[in-house]
Amino acid sequence: MPKITQLSQLDLNETYSYADYLTWQFNETVELIKGKIMLMSPAPNIEHQRIARNLYGMCYIFFRHKKCQFFPAPFDVRLYDRKKSLLANTDIHTVVQPDLCVICNPDILDKQGCNGAPDWIIEILSKGNSKREMQIKYQLYQESGVQEYWLVYPEQQAVHQFVLDDKGCYQLKCMAAEDDIVTPYLFPELAIDLAEVFENWVEE
């Protein structure tokens, strides 16, 4: 099998597995969504990175000496239906790179990243994120059993907090903005001040 060093060597209509993904050696960053290649947005702008940095700082301090581990992008997360047990690379068809994620089960961590659903995922929207892309991620995280999912809206300086209910469906638990204090459902001791999250944010 020839080395895949350019994205143009792949058929974007084809279905691929995580085993295929591991062999790719091109520069573009992609995610794999149910076997289909999804191109990620170009390198995040400075405002996106400032928000990610601020969230990282708060979460790093909180999780530093705890069982749950905190990871920023780039970090591969392999997802599949939560009713299934751990799968082999050839049977996994979804790989994403959330902006930030928290994982409490050490058994799903390996050298490649995370093999299963993180407990908490934070995604920071960029102008390059399409509405369809965000709908796909929402459904994907819900299906795979990500317990808590935050969407950060930089331009609105807002956060939407979703939590899985007993039926495995996301419920919008909180819509916060500007100088509100937001508390993760899974980690009530962690208070996130949005004024600090969006500190130094400058509208483009």
How should each PLM-predicted stretch be described?
Residues 1-204:
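Gly/Pro/Ser/Thr-rich low-complexity, intrinsically disordered segments predominantly at protein N-termini
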